[in-house]
A protein has these predicted regions:
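Bacterial Sec-dependent N-terminal signal peptides
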Residues: 1-31
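Ser/Thr-rich, low-complexity intrinsically disordered terminal regions
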Residues: 25-214
């Protein structure tokens, strides 16, 4: 047999073995256990709650405020819009309580004052709930082309705790009371009041801005 033919014969005989080897490799890959993905734990971003001055204290009282431009809108138009928004979306909001009401309305001055009482939820799940009665005063003043709003007199009270005391924002959510570790962390209990209050303030102010954004 010529050498050339011998080499061809050897190659033909080796081919099936090569295929078997390939198949074994493929099977090994198919049954190779998948690497487990590392579990990731979501970390809450507390940056806005840790900002110094996020809870303003004016003359010893916690007072959130802002002035919003509303170009082209008259005082009367803004007054009517704000009054409607406060009544329907805040006083009659989904978590409102029985004492929430308008306490002063003066169209000539563009003044709206509301005493708000509502539930503030720290946790709301089917099997676990943590909430307080949250009361505060809203003062709005409309002018031609702008309005101002202030939230003050903030108080909290657990209504599912017998003889629960009234908690004042000044004693719970200020930088001094709610921040620890040199301002790098929220205090365990006071921190949840600070977080919840800032979130609710942001929601109330956003509601008013959206109502007047025409």
């Amino acid at each position: 047999m010529k050498l050339k033919h011998l080499l061809v014969a050897v190659a033909v005989m080796a081919a099936p073995l090569a295929h078997v080897g390939d198949a074994s490799c493929v099977m090994a890959q198919l049954i190779k256990p998948k690497a487990k993905k590392a579990k990731t734990t979501a970390v809450a971003d507390d940056s806005k709650y840790l900002m110094k001055g996020a809870v303003p204290v004016v003359d010893g009282q916690v007072r959130f405020s802002e002035t919003v431009a509303a170009p082209g809108q008259t005082k009367d138009a803004l007054f009517a819009t704000l009054k409607d928004a406060v009544q329907k979306q805040i006083i009659e909001g989904p978590d409102h309580l029985e004492k929430a009401r308008l306490t002063e309305v003066d169209a000539a001055e563009g003044l709206i004052v509301a005493s708000v009482e509502e539930y503030l939820y720290f946790k709301r799940k089917a099997w676990s709930m943590d909430r307080v009665r949250f009361t505060y005063q809203l003062i709005l003043t409309a002018k031609d082309g702008s309005y101002s709003v202030e939230m003050r007199r903030l108080q909290y009270q657990y209504d599912d705790v017998p003889n629960a005391e009234v908690l004042y924002a000044e004693d719970w959510i200020t930088d001094e009371e709610a921040l620890t570790d040199g301002g790098k962390k929220l205090a365990k209990k006071a921190g949840k009041f600070r977080r919840g209050t800032i979130d609710r303030k942001d929601a109330v102010f956003a509601t008013l801005r959206q109502a007047t954004n025409k």
